[in-house]
């Protein structure tokens, strides 16, 4: 599993399409094994969704996201947890622990974490 978070100086970037950097979390056995920062190749929701798919992202944690971006992520098979703010590392840890509070999610279940 690979989690992506729009990243801004340790916190989740407020708007998905405003992000300059994504923090990626590679997960093995429900634990973060590796993280890295990657710079997207564009700003539109379709470009960002395709970029994340190219990075083999399976799950996105973010704050604000448009319905069009939600559709683009769904088209690429990327699960979405939206309405999350604060520390990127803390939200990723909460997702893995099953305690993440998102205002919107496309996740069907968490059995594959």
Q: Which residues make up each language-model segment?
A:
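Compact, glycine-rich, soluble single-domain proteins
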Residues: 34-54
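N-terminal first-folded block
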Residues: 1-40
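C-terminal structural segments of small proteins and small subunits
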Residues: 67-112
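Short Gly/Pro-enriched loop/turn and capping motifs at secondary-structure junctions
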Residues: 43, 65-67
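Short secondary-structure boundary segments
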Residues: 7, 63-64, 84-85
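Short active-site oxyanion
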Residues: 56-60, 78-80
